[in-house]
Amino acid sequence: MNISYDRYIRTTDDYHIKSVQTIFKKLYDKGYIYKGEYKGKYCTPCESFWTESQLKDGKCPDCGRDVVEAKEEAYFFKMAPFADRIEKLLTETDYLRPKTRAVELVNNFIKPGLEDLCVSRTSFKWGIPVTFDPNHVVYVWIDALSNYITALGYENDQYDDYKKYWPADVHMVAKDIMRFHAIIWPAMLMALEEPLPKHLAVHGWITFNGEKMSKSLGNVVDPLVLGERYGADAIRYHILREMALGSDSSFSNEIMIKRINSDLANGLGNLVSRTVAMVEKYFGGTLPTERESGEFDESLIETAKALRPAVDDYIEKTQLNNALAEIFKVVSRANKYIDETTPWVLAKDESNKTRLATVLYNLLDTIRIISTLLSAFMPTTMPSIWEQIGASKEDVSYENAAKFGVLPLDVTVKKGEVLFPRIDVDKEIEELNALIAKNQPKETAKPKIEGLAQIGIDDFAKVELRAAKILACEPVKKSKKLLKLTLDDGEGERTVASGISQYYKPDELVGKTIVLVANLKPAKLCGVESNGMILAADCGEDDVKVLFLDDSIPAGSRIR
């Protein structure tokens, strides 16, 4: 998909730890962090505090068990001092995109009153210690959210990019983590007296045929498979064209293929192919320098010159789908220009050669503008277009995308391969459906299970099961069976050693969400301290399968 990271970071990196400790102390010294006690109705099995109003018939709203009065020492971050500023930020500025999200944030969180945020824990030892109170470790909020700036060198000597890149022009997040980035993160930055990102853009989810993607349903779309079949640029174009900011978008193989055919093959690809072919056929590949204006020229030229400002405006508003729609309006206009000017008719009369050269030049320069503006969306294909239309690196600079007439008058073209081959829709859908069917869960013979002694619900409640995402995985040098997993458990990172190396390669596990037994006592396995255990199924002789969860389940979610 031509997606890569510039800098891979972990919250266990030394520089990040130093920065977080400095940030925590700075907020404490400013009076925004204070030590207190968390009091409330506590459910022991769920390890959760509840307010009186949250209880259901006086019991835990999650598991229905009895709750007890409990308290725990913790540090808190004051949220109330920032409530008014954050409400104005969300409702009176264009910080949040789409702005329609502001209503739910204000009504659900700010109007009821922002509660102070618990930012330390004493119930576990792993994490970043609070320098002035080592019994406490920094809880997830300050640790995780601050990595956006610590990775740039804020309060550390590792990097020197903070002044260069911060504040970010756009901070883009998914809708399920909107609250943290629209309320908590701005409050932290305000307390630190650091600038906020200029905009927070919240995108929706991609569904499949209107249904949530799920491995259990077998309808998860593999972008690598699609990229191999149609090219990364085609997939990037389809997804960005279909997704409107703030809304979920439904992915459909049929819609994708039809869009590739209509927009890319019949639209852009056909425009480039026809134009280059006519220059080669009628002028041997190089246009003469004489020009003769005629009907329809001004309309095309003005449309092409107006394209970059329109695209700039939509990108500034984080409306990438509209930016692409605007570009392809010009693609359609250029194809219509061919039909209006009928170059094949002009070519029949030698006296029309100058007019014909003008028509083809106008088309080539329009293609130059179109392809320059598409290069951020479709970076692999555009250089091929530039080579075909004879454009230099300077010709396709972003600055020149606002100008018409940049290509040399005697430009030379070079016909290349078909940019986007047409796809047989029915045949392709049949093959893709077969792939989906292949991925459907298969029924297997049930293994004989020897049961253990029954236990009570209270015994089971002692086990804390939690969703965790695998951040990194590597073999353990001293063992043939163990893999060392670095997990995000929703509160921080921890290391777990698991005897699954003969069943999984490390790169098959990275990014997966698994079930973690989170409250096992630490154990040392072949020199690795393991803080927990992941769940796997014994499917028979030499067959073990890790229990993977749906990727939409956030790390840290309790499993009951």
Tell what function each PLM region has.
Residues 199-202, 386-388, 484:
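Beta-strand segments within the central parallel beta-sheet cores of soluble alpha/beta enzyme folds
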Residues 441-560:
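Phosphate-backbone binding interfaces of nucleic-acid-interacting proteins
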Residues 1-117, 152-161, 272-311, 331-352, ...:
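Conserved, charged catalytic cores of large soluble enzymes
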